[in-house]
A protein has these predicted regions:
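Solvent-exposed beta-strand motifs enriched in subsets of small alpha/beta binding domains
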Residues: 21-23, 31-136
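Structured segments of extracytoplasmic/periplasmic soluble domains
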Residues: 71-78, 104-108, 157-160, 164, ...
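Compositionally biased amphipathic helical and low-complexity segments enriched in hydrophobic
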Residues: 7, 18-19, 135, 197
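Membrane interfacial helix-start segments of signal peptides and signal-anchor transmembrane helices
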Residues: 12-26
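N-terminal Lys/Arg-rich, disordered targeting/topogenic segments
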Residues: 1-14
Length: 206
């Protein structure tokens, strides 16, 4: 009987040890996975981004598209983007920083302005980089439309537009049109970046 008890005790200990080892392995695996996920998110290793957020300056909301277009045309003549949204808001400029957009609104008390958030689904880091480069180039274009560097940068952006998963036909078409305008030295700055309404760097300064 004593031998049977000792044998059973040994089996029980081995079973307990095996369960403990399996549990420990599971904890280490899950802990490693969680740690890597947090590390990736915290240190920017993960290539994925849910949204890219921009802050647009809205200078008017209208009941009809015709009213909005008329107001937008006036803004374009002054150097603003004058972009009309689907819900008849007229946007004058856009920034990557909310505080910049708020400063523009507060520095232009003649308009009933407000900041509108624009979120664009940029799944990967390279898309986010292209968007930010696009904004920088277009702001430079408004300041110096005959710059050779601006023309080259716009050409490069159009060529890389296919890299963006979220690109629509209208967006690429507008970029192509904008490059044509810049190359022809068209004086109408209203052709700025209409799709993302990046323009008006001189019209609305921070």
């Amino acid at each position: 009987m004593d031998n049977i008890k000792i044998s059973n005790q040994k089996k029980s200990k081995r079973t307990s040890l095996l369960i403990f080892i399996l549990f420990l392995a599971l904890v280490i695996s899950l802990g490693g996975l969680l740690g890597w996920t947090l590390y990736s998110l915290g240190f920017g290793i993960s290539p994925r981004h849910k949204m890219v957020t921009y802050y647009a300056v809205c200078l008017g909301e209208f009941d009809t598209k015709a009213q909005a277009e008329s107001f937008g045309q006036g803004l374009r003549l002054k150097g603003g983007a004058g972009f009309v949204t689907d819900d008849n808001k007229v946007l004058a400029s856009v920034y990557t920083s909310k505080s910049q957009a708020e400063n523009v609104v507060s520095n232009n008390p003649d308009y009933a302005g407000k900041v509108v958030t624009i979120e664009i689904n940029a799944e990967y880091k390279n898309e986010r980089k292209i968007l930010n480069n696009l904004i920088d180039v277009c702001i430079d274009y408004v300041k110096n439309p005959d710059s050779a560097d601006c023309i080259k940068s716009l050409d490069d952006i159009v060529k890389r537009a296919d890299e963006l998963d979220f690109v629509r036909a209208g967006f690429k078409s507008y970029l192509t049109r904008m490059v044509s305008v810049v190359k022809n030295m068209n004086s109408n700055l209203g052709y700025g970046l209409n799709y993302l309404c990046v323009s008006g760097a001189d019209f609305l300064s921070v």
